[in-house]
From Swiss-Prot:
It comes from Naja pallida (Red spitting cobra). This is Short neurotoxin 1. SUPFAM superfamilies: Snake toxin-like. Coiled coil: none annotated. Binds with high affinity to muscular nicotinic acetylcholine receptors (nAChRs) (tested on Torpedo marmorata AChR, Kd=0.07 nM) and with low affinity to neuronal alpha-7/CHRNA7 nAChRs (tested on chimeric receptor, Kd=3 uM) and inhibit acetylcholine from binding to the receptor, thereby impairing neuromuscular transmission. Produces peripheral paralysis by blocking neuromuscular transmission at the postsynaptic site. Disulfide bonds join C3-C23, C17-C40, C42-C53, C54-C59. Transmembrane segments: none annotated.
Amino acid sequence: LECHNQQSSQPPTTKTCPGETNCYKKVWRDHRGTIIERGCGCPTVKPGIKLNCCTTDKCNN
C-alpha cells in the first residue's frame, strides 16, 4: 500500500507501507490554524480530531 505522508499543505509525498491495509488523514485546529497529518494505518484519535481512513493507494491526500 502506498500512502501520502506530507503535513498540511506541503507538496505531496508518499511512502510505502508494508503490511498495512489503511492510509489515514487526521485534521484538527490549533492556534496555527488547521493541521493535517497523513500516513499509514488507521490510528485511534482523541475527540475533536477528524479522522479519515481508506484502503487504496494514495487515497489519503
